[in-house]
Amino acid sequence: MGRRQSVVCKFIQRRSLHDLRMEADRISRTAEFMAFFRALESTGPAERRVLTDPFAANLLRPNLAGAVRLAQVPGMRKIVERFADLRVPGARTSAIARTWLIDEAWIRAIKEGIEQFVLLGAGFDCRAYRLNESARAAIFEVDHPAMLSLKRSRLGMARVDVPKNVRYAGIDFNRQSVGDVLAANGFDRGKRSMFVWERVTNYLTDEAVDAVLRYVGDCEPGSRIALTYVHTGLLDGSASFFGGKRILRDVAMIDEPWTFGFDPAALVEYLRARSLRLEYDAGAREYRKDCFGGHSAKMKGYDFYHVAIACVQTGTQPQT
């Protein structure tokens, strides 16, 4: 290779790396806020916090990591929480409650002998590292290549050892098949599996959501999926939610507009047509009560953000 070609190749490599980092920065914002909320919750008194994530703070950029450190100063935690709650009403408590809820489903799946876990849109999720009971199962973290690269880089900088049972698989949900990506990374459809699809569906197309749920519905009976979704009434204006208009404006401003939602009243039939049986569906008000009990009475906002859990049915064929 000549000198000129070598210079050109190095330039292209640098540009590709730069573009990857820029893309990672763009798509990591909401994932980072989720990690921030978990890190903030982890600073609370052990007897009061509902979850502990010792890895989340390592994934934050300096300003958010600084806020977590500030929260550990006596008397400052409530102030940091209040500031976060004023900025996006309900986001923090909703995020913590649904993380707790899905954690519980994950732990139950381990006890039931589930052999594979798939994090669809893994982002800065740390279940593969903090829920140690899953060490015997295969775990697949599926997300945009730029997101996975950023996550691995930050974990590496923090000297976090990635468990040997964790595999990373890059995907563009709107353009690639989940089945193809998982198959290429050793996923076995003949084993019961637990899918977690958190904080993703609201960014996709109808076709992409349909394709993923049909794939899950065609997996081994007894497999489950825990997913989050936005009430379609927020998107089309047919329902009103506290703080709803503000959050739509905010996500549009950071170039992460919400594009998809479900009508909760139609979800049972939608899933049944894809060989899935709905086991749980609740908005933030309900799952915050499940998590925080009576303390949830004063928590407001994000009622449009649902968690649903569904199981692959036995002996059924998906409808076309």
What name fits each language-model region?
Residues Q13-V118, F124-A169, R189:
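Rossmann-like AdoMet
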Residues R29, S238-T320:
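Rossmann-like AdoMet/SAM-dependent catalytic core
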Residues I171-S177:
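Conserved acidic residues
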Residues V178-R189:
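Short amphipathic alpha-helix with an adjacent loop that forms part of the alpha/beta core around
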Residues V196:
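A conserved beta-strand element that flanks and buttresses the S-adenosyl-L-methionine
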